[in-house]
């Protein structure tokens, strides 16, 4: 090794020891001919001092981010010169030898300044030298190790599944890779290891896991990455409770890394209850504001806006004092989410109701409204009316905005909940409206994916009554973020074919795209289930950062572009020719037979 110690490891107990350190010049200060350098490596920072001799002469040429090697004696800093904000603040190294390992060009941004994200991503290798980004990547490694330790204890087998496979519809668009040796044919990068892990269960592996890279060619949304990581787990001969028990053990081990003990078992909530109370299937339970059903309260209303299948409300504590400008801003906020607006009533300090909606209510409605929704003097009541799903979603989003504006969220709190009993299917129109790629060609598509088993009570009726069928699925939510989702899978060929039929996937298409899975189910496939954790999101939560880009070594920008390498980029004409990307596949079946034949005779 070029060094004897790590810069961040030195303490007063090592005084008078001769040490060799390596790292980067973080800061340089000249004081009356004495040069002080903050020397940084992966472990932290130590102050090194150049007082005299050849090393001090050399030190005058040092600049920010020069890579250096120094040898010197550890000394206790004089009284009053200690820096108790860093672990090494009680000592300094009196340098006797200096070697410049490499110089640095002028920096595109100062590492101790707040740089723009575009610059940070373009020079990510510099960004990673900063304490925050470097810590996040090292934390991610510890997260991986902690999960592996739990799974190894339970004798899980880590298996790498293919990253070049065939295109199979899974709910998003595939990234396609041309197959040079078969012009006109393409591999697909996997959206998840879903089908292969199920085949591993058929193969008797029984307990599988993988820290898996996944790829989805989605329309770009905030804080999404085209390539991301899952901790993927699958188990044979299990039910929902078995998977949840293991998942909680994994989560407990991860949160211990940041000093938090998760209380288990984690509470469970049905999808229906979550939507009714919070307007979201991933509710943030760190604060107590809930939606209130009001349709029955307004049964006999003469106010046409509230003559709808659903009327709901959410209370903003202290919101009656908002200026008119802020109330108008709420209307624009709602319109950006596809609503016509956000009706409101202001509760005065004397209990009287104000605002445009209050004028349209009867005396009885005005008298009873505050008590019905739990509003107090000084509160604001927001309403949504119309289709149940969209109205609840609007109020759920408003609930989150209220919490942020009114500082209702404890930033140090962790609130976990399992969401169970979600619908098995949803109307295809709803899926496409929310930006998802609907699988199949019927009026119904899968909420999770096509391989999720119906709950036992829905097995006999899910194809005759798709709208009422429940999925044997479970999602884990932390602080309003879905950090994992799983299900008990279909393991019988007849049930899988019935699910495909509900989704409008023909027998022929099912055989073409999923025939290998259906064939496997015919050979004694065991009952099985699993879960996939969103590894980037979990690590971001543990690191205390807002964006998953902070915990990915080399992330893409919000537009899916890599500023560091300028990917994606055009290919050359030669690459295009060699890859066969423009080749047309040979026709099959009847089309091939109908193709005119060219005689070989001259």
Curated annotation (Swiss-Prot):
Disulfide bonds: none annotated. L-aspartate binds at residues 170, 216, 448, 489. ATP binds at residues 216-218, 225, 482, 534-537. Residues 575-589 have a biased composition (Basic and acidic residues). CDD domains: AspRS_core, EcAspRS_like_N. It comes from the Bacteria. Its EC number is 6.1.1.23. Transmembrane segments: none annotated. GO terms for cellular component: cytoplasm. Belongs to the class-II aminoacyl-tRNA synthetase family. Type 1 subfamily. This is Aspartate--tRNA(Asp/Asn) ligase. It comes from Rhodococcus opacus (strain B4). The gene is aspS.
